[in-house]
Every structure is written in structure tokens, then in C-alpha cells.
Amino acid sequence: MKQGQGAHLSGQRIGHHPTAQMNPGDGDGNGRHQVASGHASADPELMNLRIRMTNRLIWELLSREPKLQTRPRKLVSDLAKRFEAVIYKKNPNKAAYYSILNGEIFPHLQHALSTHMAQHQQGQQMLQQLTSSSSYGTTIPIPDVVQNASGNTRALYEMDNTSGPMSNGHHHFSANFPLHSTTKGASLEMSAVSMQEGKITHMIPTPGSSNQQSLPGNFHYSTGTGYLNGKSNVMAQMQEQQAPFASKINCCPVQRDLGGYAGSGVHSDILNNSSPYGVSEAHMIDGMGLHRSNVQVINRTVVPETFINPSPYGISPNKPLQRHVNPSTRSTPTPADIAASTSFNGTGSSALSTTSYLDMTTVNSLPKSRMDSGLIMSQPTIQSFQTEYYIQTEGLDLQEKISLEQLHQQVNQLHLIQPHSQYAQNQCSLKLQQQNSLHHLVMSRGNVLTQCHLGSDHAEKLLDKRNQLHSELVSSQINEHVGLTNLQGHYEQTQYHDNYKKGQMSASSQNLGIPAPHDLLPPQQQFDDGSYRLSCFLKETYTKPLQPHCKSKPMKEVIMTSLLSGKIQDGFCQKKMARDREHHPIISGWHSAGCAATSFGSEEVMENTKQYHAQARWLLFLFHAKSCTSPPGSCKSSYCDRVRELVVHLTDCQIKDCSYRHCRESKMVSDHYKNCINEHCHVCCKAKEMLRRSSELAHKQNPAEPILITQHNMNQRSADRVHGDRMDIDQAVETFDDQPPAAKRPKLQLVSPDASENVPVCQKNPGFMLQEAHPRQLDQNKKMVPDQEVDVGLDIRHPQVTLVSCHGSDEKIGAAQNTVIPGALNKIHCHVQQETVVADKESVTVVDVKKKTGSVDVTISKTGKPKVKGVSLMELFTPEQIHEHINSLRQWIGQWVQCDKCECWQHQICALFNARRNDVEEAEYTCFKCYIEEFKRGLRMPLPESVVRGAKDLPRTLLSDHIEERLFKRLREERQERANKLKTSLDEVPGADGLVVRVVSSVDKKLEVKPHFFKILQEDNYPAEFPYKSKAILLFQKIEGVEVCLFGMYVQEYGAECKFPNQRRVYLSYLDSVKYFRPDIETVSGQALRTYVYHEILIGYLEYYKQRGFTSCYIWACPPVKGEDYILYCHPEIQKTPKSDKLRQWYLSMLQKAIKENIVVELTNLYDQFFVTAKECKIKVSAARLPYFDGDYWPGAAEDIINQLQLEGDGKLLKKGRVNKIITKRALKAAGHTDLSGNASKEAMLMQKLGEIICPIKDDLIMVHLQYSCSHCCTFMVSGRRWVCNECKSFYICDRCYNAEQRLEEKERHPSNSKCLHILHPVEIVGVSEDTKDRDIILENEIFDTRQAFLSFCQGYHYQYDTLRRAKHSTMMMLYHLHNPTGPAFVATCNVCNCDIENGQGWDFKSFERKQNQLSESRRMASVNERVRQRVAEVTRHE
């Protein structure tokens, strides 16, 4: 026998260690210790990991459940230890355990809870089997039992964890488990222990001494209630003997409510005499409000205050075990009796206490499906049943019996049965038990209340306060713009008053209702038929309506109308959801939604929940008032105008403790909403969700839309028992058991328009999302609709998304439309809740409905569009990648695309939709929600990446391969350096992945020399044009599954075939980047990793061109003007534009790395190299030596200077002074002129003026020498030898200059003006290519032909990079055009019809484009000139 199963019989000691837990379901037979305090592992590192895991679990519990912060630390610690033990048992491997510790722990916490609860339930079933085979007629008292004066033994999670043997040789039994944990709630308060453990703990059975048999429990009342069915095989005898007593008294409310309606088999009486134990009647049962001395159970044992029905040994051994009470001494019951709390204990059990009369609830509101705790009969006898059972069976007519039979059929459909604390269940026939209990249930509910005399004012006050409590709870979430007309009942006020006074309230055994808010309804209307339409928080189950004759009793139509069912409703919903959720209690409870998340009987948590609801409701009201567009006084919310004034006040109020009404409170809740980072915040969670839905649907609302029935959605939610959130609770639809079953995966049906005529249209108000609709009126001559699980929702179509959903706690959800029950009311009591939401988790598809005889033939309408693979890049994604992509999106205005499945609309940018692949608008598009659904159902798989070509599919070149090879090598080295610094492995260090470098454009071009400049230098054989190759290089990185362009640069390559002065030179024309590089970390040196990557790209480029024989590179470090873009259109707002100093330093730091690698041999600037003569330079300063590049600054400036000089010579420009006044002597000497006042050449004057402009910004004009240049002739040496001076740095001369040096006299040789001579050593020049021919193919692309062309292309199509969302889409479209170069790149839009105009079909499009490019270039030059003038002025001020 397993130790966990038979310990309580063997007498062995269990759970003696303080941290040990009894695991009845474990097969090892040992109590497993939770953490290292139990059996110690041999690995100290593992012990440390387990301690860390426990601490993290404690933190998770405290952070997700604020209520636990007020509880003792030990209780939370023990709970975490138990969860840790489950996690460790599942993951004993150290590596797996470590990954869980450092990863997302919430799923594992859910699994631990589920495992723990499963073990608990298995242990309960084992104990149940043992107790069902044993008799407890005689018990052995436990001397050390502590009697609780409050009548309740309450604990958070564990109880009775005693140690040491008892004095009589018996041992304690330890069982620790939650009994009242909630799902979708905020409470982790739990009842101490179930009744059976309490019985075993305090009363030891004595075999062979029993003379009584335990009654079996009703199978339908077994799910966590602990009640025994009072209708057993002895019910007929009891009914026969109760008639004489029934004539003497009117009723016994508590007895009938507990024993008759709830089917518990427990009966109690209210006695006038005082308790024999001297207990005050006012404090009976922990303040339940039962103002009588004692409550008796079936065996007629008087219940003292300490325990309602314990063995009397612990208090007074001399007291009799049983005491029968004279029925004639009973008093007339009051409504307070009816409002008795459910905190009744079984023998030795701990009760789920209530704290005040506000928490009192009649047990008759309990459904058969769930109860939090219950009563168990101790030693019941047939005689006691026969003498003390009072039921009146008269008054139930034929029609009611028919309704009861229908009710019985529906009850049998519930799949809510889950044994929890059912301890005596094997003595009676199940069939008779079900029939009798159900019959007795309705009789006691329907007749007892009608026969009771509610003659106490206290009862009405109690009910009023109870009503007020529920009204406040409901009104905290109901929108204020719900019209009072929707809340009107169908009955007169006098009828309500009479029914309220007499207690004639009829409800089904499954129904739980919430009255209308007291601040929205008059008191006389708070209990009519319309009141149950506001059941927005608790699930409600509606049974079949009664027969038409019930109209004489209008309150029977009100299926859910008990004012006394508040607390029971909370507990019912919590327990129901605890079993319906896929996840177990506690974990699901952290998401607090759906039901009032309070501990059963906890007034404190109830008040907190009310406060949470009020704050969230007020927050939504503030948003509504802020965005409400209705004229003043016309908003359906009567308080909108006042809150608008408050919002206006809040925008300008700066006073901390402002006295303006509601100002301070509004600031607090709004500030909390802005700063809250808790994902499970009770206030912000639902407010954010509703606001998100409202913002997405604000522009889509259109009332004229058909209604859909989405069956798959309801199948999923009904089968899994997953209920909605607190503001999204659906209502019940009728179920018909006599219809044929629905298909396994039913299709969809479109409801006819007449079925939705009475459904109101949702308001265009983003602040309030819920509205209630009237029940739909159905014709009697409609055909029956087969029983199908369906969801009622408005079609999700553009421009609004509105859902009308019906949902309940029945296992089968029937169709609510076009349905009539023969002989029943022609009204379906279905409360249609209308929501304005984006979409359900399951998508909706529009289909046609074909009505046939007795069934619905549903066919899916095909789209008829061709399936073009790769129309959306998301087709390549997995659902995880789709979620990752969607989570990174932000709201933005853009073009839209409609899903062909659910017809919802999405941004093309968010959907990564390629409109170019949908030219004829015939391509089928599937949104991500439908895509995920099809993926889950196995109807779709991610397409291979080859369907949509990406950056890797672009043509590779020698240059791109060289840069990539170097980049990846350097990234591996850098990653290893970080790993060494952190003393960890390489795999544990994040690295840059998914990088691709490609040359997207490589075309031959010619640069024409400007006419004025060419005219001046024409005599020097200056070339009229320079051939060069223009290249565009891009860097891509895959971010969240999408390739994003992060970096781009344009370069000009002037090869060996080009004439002097541009021969073998490279010009870095433009460089641009966006700040989306991942990961955003730093290198070991403290440099950003993204900067490191960009530098390596530039160094790799310089290295490649040095190997090809290029000699120098020219860089103009010129940052763009604010708002100007070089290559990529629209940069992120977080990316700052660097200043000139920062940008220059950025380039210089890159070049210093290149110098260390001997790629760059020397750095200088344009001014020092060409405008100033070096010490031993033997060449004169001339404009003909300046490298002439396309788009560079000085060629344009030189043309303007020459034009100005010509105007001065012609006398057309007023001279403001002589041009030679500021020229330096050094410059005159270098130019070879001694007098510029007269006939100075235009070239010399040009160099003078140009030098004046360039000198202040000379540091920004960087000259990079890839090869050594001669110090005498300034030419780059690419062949032969270079002569090096070991004593002088940076002195190199070529062979030609060395030969000329040798012909000079010694005093004129190097170094000049020095008496000692330096010896020069020759160095052979190797590794320089004789020609610079590019062996890469020509890559032509219209959009990347020039920088301005690509920028104009992006501007025209709004391919922006200001957000990652847009950067993904822009890169996708860029790659599409790169892979399809023959397609039209520049398409204009007609100003008349807004259609695209292809090339050749528009009017003067090319000339317009040229003018735009010229205008843009002129504007750029103007801005550059202005920036240069500002820089010159700045340098002048410093000097």
C-alpha cells in the first residue's frame, strides 16, 4: 500500500518535517520535501539553484498577487516550496532547471499548480474510497483538539501540520491543499482543509462500533460542495411523516434551503431556547445573522458555537451527543433565516467563514455545478429524517412538473461535475437520487418561499443592503450611457413590491443573477425582468422558460433575480471558472477578470474589488469625456458634460491638492494608468484593453451590418469552459437536447436580417464598450434549428467591428435565433450583450445559410481569387514570429488591406502587404488572425523563404563578399572578447545575427566638368569629363523575422583609366543609417556594437580598394541639416543628427583602426594637401591638382567664385575691396605670384577665394591615403620603389624624384637647409594592382541610380524608416523592386482620379521629375553654403 494512501490507517507519522508535503498521488511513498530543507542533493550548486528558484517563485507570487503581501511570509514561502518541488520533479536535469530559472517561469508555475491540484484531487478520491467503506458511528476523541471560538478554522494554504504523536497512540494526518482558490480573480485566500480531513484529524474511527450508515452524496452535487443529497431512498418515508408537523408551523427556511433546495440533506431549525453551552445567539455561526440559539442537522445533534456539528467531546464530555428538539418550540422564521450564510461545517471541518451580514447568502442560490464548501452529514439516521423532515408537496401543478422534467434534462447536460470533497457516496441509487433531489430542489425553492411569512423589518433591511452591495458592484462596470429604457421591467411596481415582501422569487437551480445598479434604476425597478440584463460580470445559465400559464406569476419569468445570491454568485463563478479554465486556480486568478475576485466570505477583498472596478470605470469615463464628440447635453451619459469640464480643468491644473471636485482623485488614477507597468493590474489591465479596441475600431463603426454565427468560436469557448473578461462576459443561449448533435467542426451561418431587427447599434464612443440589447422576439412559426454550439456576433467588416455574443455555462450552447419551444414562451431569455471589439480570438468568416427541413445546410463561400504565393511576407512566418511582429507595431495612419477570410481591415504596413504583387487586386490575402487559426488547424504551413526573395537573394559581388567575410570574422572576435571579459561561453553572449551586405547598384557614369572651371584650366589640358563607377552598398539585418535596411552608402570610384587628378581615387559620397540595429549593446571597448559594425564595413571597403590599386579616398564629413535625409527617408525621432565635430570624430576613429591594420598609411585634409605648400614640396599650388568629384562641395563653390570674378571684371558687380588684402605671403609664394593687384590670373584668384572658404572647415574634408605619396611631387607611388628616410617621419619620394635628388648638390638635398645629410633607403612597392578594372558585373537599378532617385522613390511611396514597423515594410518593398528591376519604379498619381500613371502615359512626368531633382540639389547646395558660412563665422570668432 502506498504511504500516501494508507497512512491514516497504519498509524505511521506523515509530514513531520515542517516543509514536507503529503503527496497522495506520488508513487514513491515518501513525503517530498519542497526545497533543499528536505532530502539534500549531493550537488551544492543544484541546491543553490533550487533556493534561487524558490525565492523567485516567492517574488512571482507576491508580485502577481498583492493580497499575499499582507499574509505571513512563511505561508507564501511554503506555497513557493511546493511549486518548486513540482518543477524540480519534472526537470531534474540541472541544465533544464537552470534554463527555467533564467527564463520565463510563468508557464512552469502554471504546470506546478495544475500538478499540485491533480495530486490533491487524487488524494481526495482515495480518502473518499476509504471513508465510503468505513463507518464512523463511534469516534475516539482527540484530547488536544483546540476549539475555535469563531466556529471556523481558517488558513491560507496549509492546516493541521502538527507534529508528534497523540496521547492515545494515534497520529495526526497532514493534508495541505487549497479549497477556495479562484481563477480569474485576485484572491489567493483558501479554506483551510476539506471536511473529511478535519474529521480524520479530530475523530479517529472505531471499527465495528457503528450502528448507522452514511447516506450517499448526490452525483450532481459533488463538485467541491461536500453536500449530501437529502433526497435518498428514505425520502418517501420522510414526506409521509412530516404532514402533522407541517400543519403546526409555516416553514423552516434554513432547513428547506439547505436540505431541500441545495440537495444537501442537512436540515436545521431555529430555536427560541438558548444554547446549552451558553453561546449567545447573536454570534451564532460566526456572525451569520441567525438570531436563534442553535442550528440542527439531520441527526438532531445540537450544534455548539465552536463547531457547528463536531463531536461534543472537546468542550464538555458530559454533554449528550444528541438532543432532539420539540418542534412546537420553533418560532416563525424571518428573511434573516433565509439569508443564512453558507459557512456550515461538517463534522470537525473548517468553515468558509463570512465576516458580516452583508456577506450572507441563501444556500438555495447554489447551483448543482459548483460550491466552495459544503456540509456533510455526520451519523445521519433514518429516524431523524422521518421525524424532522418537513416538505410541503402540494402546490406543484402539471405545468410546473413539465418544466421540472425539462429542467432535469438540462441539468443532466452539465459537464461541471468534478469530485472535490465528496466523502459518502455509495449507499443509494444514483438515478433515484437525481430525480428526487431535482424535484425536491424546485419544490423547496418554489413553494417554501411562497409559504413563508416575511414579517420582519430586519429582513427587508438585510435584503436592501444586500441589494445595494450587488448594485454597487454591478454599477462599477456598467456603462452610464445604458438607457433606462433597456432596464425597464415588464411588470408593475406593485407586483415587485408584493413579491419582494413575500419572498416569491423563482429561480432555476442553475441561475445566478445580479440586480440592476441602484444608481441607474428606481428601487421598484431593480428587481424586474430587465434587471438580469445587466449581468456583465458573472456567467448566467438560463434554463427553458416555464409554460405560458406562468404569466399569472410574473416573477417566475425572471430566471435570475435573487438579491441574496451575491456571495454565492462570487463563489460559484470562481469555482466554476476554476474548473473550466485550462489552467488551475491561483495562476489564472492573477489575471483577475470575469468574476468578482474575492475570497468566499471575505468582505475585505470584496471592498477592494469594488474599488478596483470603480477606478477602472472612472478611468474609462475620463477617456470617454476626453474624446466624446457629442454636442454638450446630447451625450447619452448624463454625467458626460460634468466630466468634460473636469477634463478641461485637469489639462491646466498644476495644484497638487486641488480642491476642484474629483480633480485629485482623477489625477491619481490617471497618473497610475500612465506609469503602471504591471501587466496584471486590476485597474489598468482591462482599461488598456478596452481603449486599444476602441482606438482600432473608432473609424470602422457602421451600424448596418449582418449578424454572423461563428460556431467554431463558441465550440472552443464552450468546450474549454474559458470565460471572457470582466467587461466581455457573454450571456447564455438556450440549449435543446432533443435536437441532433452538431458536426465536429461546424461551419458558419449567416442569420437573416429579421433576426437582428431588435439589436441596437453600438455607439460610436471609444470610452464605453458595452451595451445591452433587448431579448430577441421570435416568431412561433419558425422552424427548429438543430442544436449547435454557436457564437452570435456582428460581421467583422469595414468600417466597424461589432460583436453580439451569447455564451453561458451550459455545456451545449444552442442557437438563439429562429427557435421556438412548442408550448413554451415565445421569448428566448437570452441577454444579448453587444461589444465593440477588434475581433474575437477566433476569426469570423462570412458564409451563406441554406435552410432545409429540420436542419441547417451551411456552405463556405470561396473567394474565387487566385492564390499568389508570397503576397504577404507574413506567409513565411511561424505564429511566434507573427506575434513578435505584431507586438512591435504602433498605431499609424496608412493604407489598408482587407482579409478575404474574415473581411477585417488592416494597415498594409502592419500586415507587411505588398501591393505590387496585387496589381489586379485579385490576390487572396489572409490576415494574421486567420493565418494563425489555419496554422493551428493544420490547414496552412509557413511558405519556404524562396517564395519571397530577400536580401540574401540579391546578387553577390566580390566587394560584398569581401566586406561580409571581414565583418563576420571581426564580429566573432569581438563576441569572443566579450565572452572572455564576462568569463562565460561564446553561446551565452549575444551577438549580431542575420546581417547581409549587398551592392545594389554598380553603374558606369561620367562626370562633366563645369564650364567656367573648365574654361580656366583648358590651357593645362584639363580633361572635360571624368569617367567613374557609382556604387550603392546596403546593410540588411533580419529583425523579428523581417529584413530591415539599416545602413547605406554611395561611393564614386575613379580608376586607373581616369585622367589626373582623379586617377585611382575613391570618393565616399553619402552615408546614412537608422538606429534599429540589434542587439543594442556595447563592445568591450565601450563602443556601440552598431558603430563597430558600420566601421568594419567602411574599413573592409577601403581594404578591398587598396588591394585593387586605388591610392586615396576622400571623405567630406558633412552632417545633414535637421529634417534632411541623405539616403533613407525619414529617420527615427530617437536618432539625433550628429554635429560636425561628432561626425568627424566618428570617421577619424574608424580611420585610426584602419591605420593600425596598415590599410590607411596617412591622414590629411584637402586644404593642407592642395592649398598649402609643404616644407619640401616642389610643386606649385594649382586648381588643376584638386580632385574633382561629383556632388563635392568645392566644384560648386568654385563655379560660383568664377562667375563672381567675371562679374567683377565686367564691372557688373560692385567691388567691396581688393581680393588680395587677406592673402598670405605663404600663399603668394606658393602660387608663384608676387603681385596680385594687377593682372592676377583667374586661377590664382580662384584658389585664393576657395582657400578662404575651405580653411575654416578643412578638418571636415578628410583625405585618406591608401598608398604612400611622394613628398616632392605629391604623386602616389604604385610601382617601383619608394625611398624612405629613417630619421624623418612621413618623408617618402619616388624613383623619379630620388634620381633628381641625387643630381643636386648636397646642401640642397634632403633635408633642405640642413648641414647633415639623411640617408634614404629604398623599399619595393608590391601588392598594388597595375589596373583597377572592376571585375564585378554591372548592376543597374532605376531607383538606386542616384541617391536622390532613391530618396524620391521612397518619398513618393511613403517608404519611411521613422519607425521599425515602417522600416520593415519599406525594406520589403525595396527588396521587391530590387528583385524586379523591369517593373515601373516611379509611378505618378493622377490628380483627378488618384490612379497610378505608368511611364509614357502621363503628361510631362519625366521633365517634372528632373526639375524636382534639380530643385532638390540646388536646395541642398544652398543649405550647405549656409552651413559653411556659419562654420566660417564660428571659426573666425574663436580666432
Curated annotation (Swiss-Prot):
What's the Enzyme Commission number for this chain? 2.3.1.48
Q: Where is the composition biased (Polar residues)?
A: 325-335
Location in the cell: Nucleus
Task: Indicate the segments annotated as coiled coil, or none if absent.
Answer: 964-989
Principal cellular location given in the protein's record: nucleus
Zinc finger annotations (ZZ-type) as residue ranges: 1265-1328
Single GO MF descriptor: transcription coactivator activity
Ranges for domain CBP/p300-type HAT: 948-1383
Keywords, comma-separated and alphabetical? Activator, Acyltransferase, Chromatin regulator, Coiled coil, Metal-binding, Nucleus, Transcription, Transcription regulation, Transferase, Zinc, Zinc-finger
From the UniProt record, list the reaction(s) this protein catalyses. L-lysyl-[protein] + acetyl-CoA = N(6)-acetyl-L-lysyl-[protein] + CoA + H(+)
Sites binding Zn(2+) 2 sit at C1285, C1288, H1310, H1318
The record, for PROSITE patterns, names:
CBP_P300_HAT, ZF_TAZ, ZF_ZZ_1, ZF_ZZ_2
For this protein, the record's Pfam families field holds: HAT_KAT11, zf-TAZ
Q: Per its UniProt entry, what is the enzyme's top EC class, as one word?
A: transferase
Query: What is this protein's function per UniProt?
Result: Acetyltransferase enzyme. Acetylates histones, giving a specific tag for transcriptional activation.
| Designated name of the protein | Probable histone acetyltransferase HAC-like 2
- List the source organism: Oryza sativa subsp. japonica (Rice)
Name the lineage. Answer: Eukaryota, Viridiplantae, Streptophyta, Embryophyta, Tracheophyta
